[in-house]
A protein has these predicted regions:
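Loop-to-transmembrane helix entry/capping segments in MFS-fold secondary transporters
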Residues: 78-94
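Hydrophobic core of transmembrane alpha-helices in multi-pass small-molecule transporters
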Residues: 47-66, 70
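C-terminal ends and interior cores of transmembrane alpha-helices
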Residues: 30-44
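A membrane-interface helix-boundary motif in multi-pass transporters
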Residues: 111-142
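A gly/Pro-rich, aromatic-decorated transmembrane alpha-helix motif that marks the paired
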Residues: 100-116
């Protein structure tokens, strides 16, 4: 637990140095690589499997904490572009989108389990357990890739743009 705390304490410094978008993108790429390696190796030792997932989800933890700071950057960018600060509206849209994503992923999980033939009667069949393993590696890897690509190609707030927005708002508010 202390080790994880130390990792996350460094996150703020890394985000300041490289940028939030950049750090979030890299954390998703590293998580993808870890998931793919786990899928390819198919570890038979449960602790090796757990190790891969702990490492991948430390990366997810980076993203999940950075995203909250990125919301503030979006609010600042909106204020620079529109001249009004819309904290509540932007946060509400983000919160709603997050809830939609969580609902979708919950439904997807059930659908994937059905697709591999999971039921109470087949829970320990080798084909089903291998299917669960495959889903547990492939589904997160696909999600991490989708997030990394979205951040890289769609999310416009690079470190430089965020710094420009901060300067513009400082100048605007000091008048």
């Amino acid at each position: 637990s202390r080790g994880f705390g130390d990792v996350y304490k460094r996150q703020s410094k890394l985000a300041s140095r490289f940028g939030k978008k950049e750090l979030a993108t890299v954390s998703c790429i590293v998580a993808t690589v870890l998931e793919v390696i786990c899928f390819v190796l198919k570890p038979t030792n449960v602790w090796v499997y757990v190790g891969f997932f702990c490492a991948a989800f430390i990366c997810l933890g980076f993203f999940n904490t950075i995203i909250w700071a990125m919301i503030t950057d979006v609010i600042d960018d909106s204020e620079v572009r529109n001249g009004i600060r819309e904290d509540g509206t932007i946060y509400a849209v983000y919160s709603f989108a997050r809830k939609l994503g969580q609902a979708f992923s919950s439904g997807l999980t059930g659908g994937l389990l059905t697709m591999i033939g999971y039921s109470a009667a087949t829970a320990f069949d080798p084909e089903v357990t291998m299917g669960i393993f495959n889903i547990s590696c492939i589904a997160p890897a696909i999600g991490f890739v989708a997030v990394a690509l979205s951040l890289f190609f769609i999310y416009p707030l690079t470190k430089q743009k965020v710094e420009e927005n901060v300067a513009a708002l400082a100048q605007r508010h000091n008048k």
